A protein has these predicted regions:
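Catalytic-core loop-and-flanking beta/alpha module that positions acidic residues
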Residues: 1-176
Length: 176
């Protein structure tokens, strides 16, 4: 499982090529997300986001020299033309049976199989903000209700085209 994230919410290019300004951008508190990843059972989870490296030239590391560098290069390298995305990636690998086995020395250390997931859940407090695209329609605006149900304190913004510059502005929507 790969979760691709961005450090920016107001990129004209990303809003344009991800659903022509009709999508949403969700702001996460990564420190709070990491706490949930600490508690994930049965998973190999890397709770830290890896920043994507942008390159003009392909320089593959040697797998036999440094396995970690090789993995990072394969999973976190993109062409330099994508640099405006400021992307970071998180990885969660499928559970392995031996990770889910209880400690043989501690019989009370049984794992409740209902708590083992292939995808960790995060709490509503992890969702800090939601940005609605410039061209979002009324049907999609029902997302505000869903967002408020997850986190009543979530901040909701409507993206608007700036009339004086080639950029987007995030306008805070008052609570209704």
């Amino acid at each position: 499982w790969v979760c691709c994230l961005s450090k920016v919410f107001d990129s004209l290019l990303m809003w344009a090529y991800y659903n022509n300004h009709r999508g949403v951008c969700i702001g996460l508190n990564m420190e709070k997300v990491a706490k949930y990843f600490d508690a994930s059972l049965g998973l190999i989870v890397d709770k830290h986001a890896h920043e994507v490296q942008y390159r003009d030239i392909i320089e593959k590391p040697d797998y036999f020299q440094n396995e970690e560098d090789f993995f990072h290069y394969q999973m976190c390298t993109k062409a330099k033309v994508w640099e405006h995305e400021q992307e970071a990636r998180m990885f969660i690998f499928k559970p392995f049976p031996w990770i889910m086995l209880p400690d043989s020395n501690n019989k009370s250390d049984l794992i409740d199989r209902k708590e083992v997931r292939a995808f960790p859940r995060i709490g509503g407090e992890c969702f800090e903000s939601i940005y609605l695209g410039v061209n979002i329609n009324e049907k999609e605006s029902g997302l505000i209700k869903i967002a408020k149900k997850l986190n009543p304190d979530i901040k909701v913004y409507q993206m608007k085209k700036n009339t004086n510059a080639f950029k987007l502005d995030a306008i805070h929507i008052n609570d209704e």
